[in-house]
Amino acid sequence: MRIILITGISGSGKSVGLTSLEDAGYFCVDNLPPTLLRALVATRQEEHADKLAVAMDARSASSLIGLPADIAWLQSQGHEVKVLFLTAKTDSLIARFSETRRSHPLSHRGFSSTAAEDRRTLTECIREEREMLSGVEEISHVIDTSGMSANKLRGWIKALIESDHSPLTVLFESFAFKFGVPLDADLVFDVRMLPNPHYDSQLRPLTGRDAPVQAFLQDQPDATALLADIRGFVEKWLPAFKKDNRSYLTVAIGCTGGQHRSVYMVEQLAAHFRAHEHVILRHRELD
């Protein structure tokens, strides 16, 4: 049976993720206490189910301590198990809670009357939840949903599901340092030392997907050398990541604005590795 466990920080999109899996044919259970996981799997197996998705949150944090052992046991029974940990930057989470006017699951009282006090209380809840779930995050594939719409997250989950046949999926992601490093990055490369097409008035409105920008960077010896170095590094260490039984490897490339240099590098890397790996491409500031 294919089993996907979804957990993570409240407000990061677990409900959207679970709905996406339901649309993909998974039998979904929300807010399942981890102690009931094995029993649920046994029941679904008796019913000859082949896909199961389960969402768990911080209210079960104490029970989640035993999750690694549960995963190992399920795998020993022949099940394919993946754990997705959804997270987002604190500012994004605060904005989402503000929009929905919902209280945090760890809050034991209603929000105070002032916005400043609301923000402080919510921030404390988010910080506590991160600490409670830090152990689970370490054994999961992390997805940073900061700035993602619900539709984008659905597409991201769909791409991950479609990669289930591959032992390792490589995710190449471009980003802007001014908006922060992606929380789900395993490897981060800084390409801000390369000549910036932004300062060419004809190239400024374009992106690293466009031929003129690509031609500009291909003419830069440093860009060619850096691309070769990053490609070589990933090629050298990819076998080690596979031996570590990882399902996903996220390689993040950053520049100042996430429009030109990082986009170009990610496009080139994705094109190269698609020949022999399952690749997913994401431009955080463009998509």
From Swiss-Prot:
Kindly give the NCBIfam families that the UniProt entry links to this protein. PRK05416.1
Mention any Pfam family matching this sequence: RapZ-like_N
Q: InterPro entries from the xrefs? A: P-loop_NTPase, RapZ-like, RapZ-like_N, RapZ_C
Q: Which family does it belong to?
A: Belongs to the RapZ-like family.
Q: Which GO terms describe its molecular function?
A: ATP binding; GTP binding
| Function (record text) | Displays ATPase and GTPase activities.
Report residues binding GTP: 57-60
Stored HAMAP family: RapZ_like
Keyword ATP-binding among UniProt keywords: yes
Name recorded for this polypeptide: Nucleotide-binding protein mma_3120
SUPFAM superfamilies cross-referenced by the UniProt entry: P-loop containing nucleoside triphosphate hydrolases
Q: Which residues make up the binding site for ATP?
A: 8-15
Give the UniProt keywords, A-Z.
ATP-binding, GTP-binding, Nucleotide-binding
